[in-house]
Curated annotation (Swiss-Prot):
Region called Conformational epitope, residue ranges: 29-37, 31-48
Species lineage: Eukaryota, Viridiplantae, Streptophyta, Embryophyta, Tracheophyta
Quaternary structure (record): Homotrimer. Hexamer. Each subunit is composed of an acidic and a basic chain derived from a single precursor and linked by a disulfide bond.
Protein name: 11S globulin seed storage protein Ana o 2.0101
Its biological purpose: Seed storage protein.
Chain segments carrying region Mouse monoclonal antibody (mAb) 4H9-binding: 41-55
Stated consequence of mutating residue 57 to A: Significantly reduced binding to mouse monoclonal antibody (mAb) 2B5
Outcome following mutation: residue 34 to A: Significantly reduced binding to mouse monoclonal antibody (mAb) 2B5
Binds goat polyclonal antibodies (pAbs): annotated segments: 32-45, 55-86, 215-239
Length: 457
């Protein structure tokens, strides 16, 4: 099964599917969007942005936000599209079940009579802890669950890449539930929203009893005829699973990251199916300032997560950027060469301007905490913090997303001859030199010497 799974993954690597219909990205106005639908469950809520909005249709993605209360369990589910999950706040644990991979977490055997008695000790696949700032990657069709073991709510934002080649259905985001009776959070527009059911509900009870070799009474429990929904409270105020202690888990995570760093440093690669699938890294934290790729004191930082430092992203054809700007700081104008950028405000608010291929300003406003903004591929964008710190995360639809700056030391204009700029803009060569060399920052700059962005279109 592991071999088949590997072949399936490699068959999905070619490229994102060309789902876009003609004129689907002919957008003359962008908006910072709040979720359109909200569903409340026993131990949490699920919110979704309308996947049929023109911004999300252009980018080929769907977005959902989960809030899980303490001791809440997000029931097992999978999707028709690969997912990137960003943990906005909270901590907990998650299980991601790959077909064909061994159950490496096992309870200790109680005596040698266990096999003779016919009773089995529990065993399951690896459980991963998560915390604020973690990115969790989940391929299409892979089941996962999530549990809040902290004292405050867990909030996550999930991108579903419905245009990805791993999705061979249509562009409708689908959640397939293995338990519970959750509603379809993406179908708010339907006035008569049908009650959700899990996959087992659709099968014949007798057939399932034969498949599991249990009685029909137990199968009826699998069909979950209750009203708790998709996020439920765990009995006894604790989810009892097999896992290392917190200190052991943290040490293991650190040693795993050090091992990966060492392999990258010496150019080594993992080899073997078990290492590629069953023990691959699915999680990385991008909230630590020490991991910043671009950092300017008192201005801000940018941290990039792509297929170079989390290899599974090559399979998913996705990447992520985390940004932090301090008061009045600026991300220099740029465009994304090979991806759409889906911006989610994590903290504070920032001023953003986006310009299309006609030179029209299609967005000029604020992106606040909890809002989403799509910046289509090649549209130029600039971000600026206002009177407070602004934090955001950008999901990008390419595993090695690239940007091209319009200003600064590495800008596209800086790579052109002065004479070209002088003739293009009808300016002197001295002014052309100012355009090329006045700002020697590469990506981030302080707002002290810059003028406010004006409405001088």
């Amino acid at each position: 099964l592991s071999v088949c799974f590997l072949i399936l993954f490699h068959g999905c690597l070619a490229s994102r599917q060309e789902w876009q219909q003609q004129d689907e990205c002919q957008i003359d106005r962008l908006d910072a969007l709040e979720p359109d639908n909200r569903v409340e469950y026993e131990a949490g809520t699920v919110e979704a942005w309308d996947p049929n909005h023109e911004q999300f249709r252009c980018a080929g993605v769907a977005l959902v936000r989960h809030t899980i209360q303490p001791n809440g369990l997000l029931l097992p589910q999978y999707s028709n599209a690969p997912q990137l999950i960003y943990v906005v706040q909270g901590e907990g644990m998650t299980g991601i079940s790959y077909p064909g991979c061994p159950e490496t977490y096992q309870a200790p055997q109680q005596g040698r009579q266990q096999g003779q008695s016919g009773r089995f000790q529990d065993r399951h696949q690896k459980i991963r802890r998560f915390r604020r700032g973690d990115i969790i990657a989940i391929p299409a069709g892979v089941a996962h669950w999530c549990y809040n073991e902290g004292n405050s709510p867990v909030v996550t934002v999930t991108l579903l890449d419905v245009s990805n080649s791993q999705n061979q259905l249509d562009r409708t985001p689908r959640k397939f539930h293995l338990a519970g009776n959750p509603k379809d959070v993406f179908q708010q527009q339907q006035q008569h929203q049908s009650r959700g059911r899990n996959l087992f509900s659709g099968f014949d009870t007798e057939l399932l009893a034969e498949a599991f070799q249990v009685d029909e009474r137990l199968i009826k429990q699998l069909k979950s005829e209750d009203n708790r929904g998709g996020i439920v409270k765990v009995k006894d105020d604790e989810l009892r699973v097999i896992r290392p202690s917190r200190s052991q888990s943290e040490r293991g995570s650190e040693s795993e990251e050090e091992s990966e760093d060492e392999k990258r440093r010496w150019g080594q690669r993992d080899n073997g199916i078990e290492e590629t699938i069953c023990t691959m890294r699915l999680k990385e934290n991008i909230n630590d300032p020490a991991r910043a790729d671009i950092y300017t004191p008192e201005v801000g930082r940018l941290t990039t997560l792509n297929s170079l430092n989390l290899p599974i992203l090559k399979w998913l054809q996705l990447s992520v950027e985390k940004g932090v700007l301090y008061k009045n700081a600026l991300v220099l104008p740029h465009w994304n060469l090979n991806s759409h950028s889906i911006i989610y405000g994590c903290k504070g608010k920032g001023q953003v301007q986006v310009v299309d291929n006609f030179g029209n300003r299609v967005f000029d406003g604020e992106v606040r905490e909890g809002q989403m903004l799509v910046v289509p591929q090649n549209f130029a964008v600039v971000k600026r913090a206002r009177e407070e710190r602004f934090e955001w995360i950008s999901f990008k639809t390419n595993d090695r997303a690239m940007t091209s700056p319009l200003a600064g030391r590495t800008s596209v204009l800086g790579g052109m001859p002065e004479e070209v700029l002088a003739n293009a803009f009808q300016i002197s060569r001295e002014d052309a030199r100012k355009i090329k060399f006045n700002n020697q920052q590469t990506t981030l700059t302080s707002g002290e010497s810059s003028h406010h962005m004006r409405d001088d279109a």
